[in-house]
């Protein structure tokens, strides 16, 4: 249900976009793909699990394999992890409740299309809105992820300190966003499209969406 939010944010940046119904499949040769937030299939079974097994995800994986930029946001991040586009999994928040609030993110890797507008260590404010946003992954796989510089963002406080108190959902090592095997595929739980329009609040999320320019 965040598809229109994503379209509005992209079009505010001058990026033409269209909403594609899952049953219709992807148009040929898209310049980029956003898997938006929402509650696909009511989040039954696990958030993103059923949507990850729909035929259009075969199209998305094929596009990603060909080098098309793919960004999964919130439920789109859950779908991305469930479909194997990115490592790890997103599970129930430590609080065991839905959380909708602004959070701070620290940029961990600025050498990607999604973070080219920032510097390493920059702190941006972007809202979250999820009940299953806690990032989990085996310790050895997390170590490999960190060694490969595939962590995009971590939850932090306003000063950029990654602390347990600043971690809204209990994500392992404060991870808020990660890259796939290649840096043109990324997922994150916070909503950059909700931090892109100056008439509703901070615009720190614009830099992420500018990867589609």
Positions of predicted regions on the chain:
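C-terminal and late-domain segments of enzyme folds
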Residues: 9, 114-213
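Glycine-rich His-Gly loop
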Residues: 37-39, 75, 131, 190
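N-terminal beta1-alpha1 cap of cysteine-dependent amidohydrolase-like domains
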Residues: 1-73, 80-87, 91-98, 106, ...
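Short acidic/polar capping segments at secondary-structure boundaries
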Residues: 76-78, 85, 96-97, 109-112, ...
């Amino acid at each position: 249900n965040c598809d229109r939010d994503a379209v509005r944010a992209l079009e505010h940046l001058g990026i033409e976009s269209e909403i594609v119904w899952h049953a219709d499949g992807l148009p040929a040769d898209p310049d980029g793909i956003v898997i938006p937030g929402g509650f696909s299939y009511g989040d039954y079974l696990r958030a993103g699990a059923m949507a990850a097994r729909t035929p259009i995800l075969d199209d998305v994986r094929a596009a990603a394999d060909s080098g098309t930029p793919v960004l999964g946001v919130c439920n789109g991040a859950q779908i991305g992890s469930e479909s194997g586009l990115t490592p790890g999994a997103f599970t129930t928040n430590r609080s065991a409740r839905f959380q909708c609030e602004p959070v701070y993110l620290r940029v961990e890797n600025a050498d990607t299309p999604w973070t080219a507008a920032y510097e390493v260590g920059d702190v941006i404010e972007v809202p979250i809105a999820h009940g299953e946003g806690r990032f989990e992954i085996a310790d050895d796989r997390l170590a490999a992820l960190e060694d490969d510089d595939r962590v995009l963002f971590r939850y932090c406080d306003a000063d950029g300190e990654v602390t347990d108190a600043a971690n809204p959902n209990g994500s392992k090592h404060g991870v808020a966003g990660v890259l796939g095997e290649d840096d043109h595929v990324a997922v994150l739980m916070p909503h950059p499209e909700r931090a892109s329009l100056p008439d509703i609040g901070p615009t720190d999320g614009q830099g992420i969406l500018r990867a589609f320019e």
